[in-house]
Amino acid sequence: MPQMDPELFDRGQFQAELALKSSPIAAFKKAIRHAREVLDARFKGGRDIRRLVEDRAWFVDQILQEAWKRFAWSEDADIALLAVGGYGRGELHPYSDIDLLILLDSSDHEIFREPIEGFLTLLWDIGLEVGQSVRSVDECAEEARADLTVITNLMESRTIAGPEHLRQRMQQVTSSEQMWPSKHFYLAKREERKARHAKYNDTEYNLEPNVKGSPGGLRDIQTVLWVARRQFGTLNLQALVGQGFLLESEYALLSSSQEFLWKVRYALHMLAGRAEDRLLFDYQARIAALFGYQDGDGKRSIEHFMQKYYRVVMGISELSDLINQHFEEVILRAGESGPATPLNSRFQVRDGYIEVTHPNVFKRTPFAILEVFVLMAQNPEIKGVRADSIRLLRDSRHLIDDDFRKDIRNTSLFIELFKCKEGIHRNLRRMNRYGILGRYLPEFGHIVGQMQHDLFHIYTVDAHTLNLIKHLRKFRWPELAEKFPLASKLIDRLPKPELIYLAGLYHDIGKGRGGDHSELGAVDAEAFARRHQLPAWDSALIVWLVQHHLVMSTTAQRKDLSDPQVIHDFAQFVGDQTHLDYLYVLTVADINATNPSLWNSWRASLLRQLYTETKRALRRGLENPLDREEQIRQTQSAALDILVRGGTDPDDAEQLWSQLGDDYFLRHTANDVAWHTEAILQHPADSGPLVLIKETTQREFEGGTQIFIYAPDQHDFFAVTVAAMSQLNLNIHDARIITSTSQFTLDTYVVLDADGGSIGDNPARIKQIREGLIEALKNPDEYPTIIQRRVPRQLKHFAFAPQVTIHNDAQRPVTILELTAPDRPGLLARIGRIFLEYDLSLQNAKIATLGERVEDVFFVTDANNQPLSDPELCARLQETIVRRLSEPSAQPQSLQIDI
């Protein structure tokens, strides 16, 4: 720390200020304000961050010493003021904790009670927020023995004022000889680190990471230092080089990474004006600009900055793991190493960990760089790689060049990994962590740490890719067969499972370059297959899956699956059962690996429906498609059988059906038609709206809640219905609107509750929904359709202009209106009002929310039940929707993620 820095704090000038003022508080506050301005200016001017955090700690030392002097401590008083924790290390960010220990020789605090209280009150009055404790030396020993946090803080202490001998005594009584021997300390810190990582989902790749506590954050570096200090007495990272725990290159990487995170943390505190260690969306773009990042190479400035951040913390995690593995071997298993079990001439297993048989293995036989991961997959009982061998792997990465990538031994080993029955995900993750995967596949290296700046994709591209492969593996777990029944069955039937893993590895590899990532990825996948000499059929399937990995999800999401033509077109697209099976399994894994909130029961039901209907179409033969008339006849016949068995007069049913039109029977199953018909025939015409509620399926992990409404068609009926459902905390995923020739509306909605599940067997909730809808629909003109809700913080950072496309369906007499817009309260109700103004009839709607945006599809007709044919009308409609949804009140609403 600096000995003197008059620009930051001029003691003479400060004391002169004190002498002029009746109260010292103003002088202290002025000094603190001035120092903050100076330090912020130095930061913006590019001051070395290490100097900067030391400068701030030095300044706080001066302020505390001046404050301490204002109280009547006798010269021989056995009381001292100590800095502990991060402040004790001499590191302070703008709003870091200032942890103080007032250390006494005696446990009799009373004799110093009054000056201590006065000192702490002064600190509070001048705006210096401190964390303080008052203890005797013996009390320090007692509390440190019982509390890991206390002993950790006391290990890093400095005397600010008072006699130094008190601190030295405290250090003696809390040394590893007295308490917390290094083995126990390491075990406790290991568990603490594990719990901390779990708090942040065990990933470096959170959308809004904590630069201090997240995996790969500053706390991981500090944990290494704490353990090293307890074991070896080392005071800094560089000392670990002398102990043999770090190479010079590793020290340089850790040191530069720490400096980068310090800069980010300093900027966070400065921008937030408070202690803020979360890299929130609020600050990401501002820090990217502050650090000079710019748009380019197909990425926005914020994505460049966050990729740098993620790569830094991944590097810290890698080195932290390496050092902790060393600690395991030196501290926990010192002198207890067991015999080695040979695997081959290059590798052996010792104490459950694989290691090289000699230090030149990778230099002499470079293919061993990939072989080690195959061996671990083939021997799943191996826990991991020993620290020295990890270091050799890291140091051998330069051997992976173009010649290495073309070597048939290496290409064969890489493919062999994907044929292993276990450990594919685990070892790909290790390869990524050790920097091998991105080196062997440069196109994969490009996506390491690549974020997408939205709330839909909550992982970086590389983390999502490995997560997808993990989900493919999990489909084989018996305990998940109930949640993923179809995927679990199909994964074992795929003729070559390794192909779906390879397709998964490449499905998003084209992201971050600009252009269509599916097309770019398909080109890379084809080059990979050629380099690895895969058979033509295998290569073609992988490329097809990569190129079309979004098609099944998009079809299920945005197309009307009740339309036989949609099913026929999709069956023609996949071509055969094998392609359908592979694509379904890949799609389910992709959705689950994108965001845990995406996979809900309704999406599962849609994909199963598309899979099942397509399978039937393939069995029937693509040359024999099911036509509309045949499907209508089948539905009516089956529904009539159900009704007659239940005692319904078939003539009454057919008279009602004659008013409904063909689309009703295309969009509903026979069971639903019978359910609706029986209820309508029994419902008195003058008794208000009929509202029916039931589950779409009895499968536990599939389906949603179906709400059927039968009532006279009225002004603003759709807008009121969806507004009422919003007030009832229901999320609409599907809407089917039928108007009978007798001017009754038959509306069917599929909804999920606010938690993403169906309503289920909950009589009280069902009663609440039914009564709420009936009450709203009795007087729709009086019901407010504009919902006012607070905008969640995260959504405020993803505003964009709504986009509307309008085109006519080539197969059916309807117009398709596709909307992409920021999520917002009452959006469907506003759309319904616009349709009313333009005298449009809504036939069907597919509702989807992807993070911060909606992607909805509406199927509409004009007043004569015909598709829109006037280009000027379509242009006005498009302009109206964009303008209304762009109004200041049209802000994003609460987050409901669905694909």
From Swiss-Prot:
Keyword Protein biosynthesis appears in the UniProt entry: no
Known EC number: 2.7.7.59, 3.1.4.-
Known cofactor(s): Mg(2+)
UniProt-listed GO biological process terms: regulation of nitrogen utilization
Start and end residues of each HD domain: 461-583
Described purpose of this protein according to its UniProt entry: Modifies, by uridylylation and deuridylylation, the PII regulatory proteins (GlnB and homologs), in response to the nitrogen status of the cell that GlnD senses through the glutamine level. Under low glutamine levels, catalyzes the conversion of the PII proteins and UTP to PII-UMP and PPi, while under higher glutamine levels, GlnD hydrolyzes PII-UMP to PII and UMP (deuridylylation). Thus, controls uridylylation state and activity of the PII proteins, and plays an important role in the regulation of nitrogen assimilation and metabolism.
Protein name as annotated: Bifunctional uridylyltransferase/uridylyl-removing enzyme
Gene name linked to the record: glnD
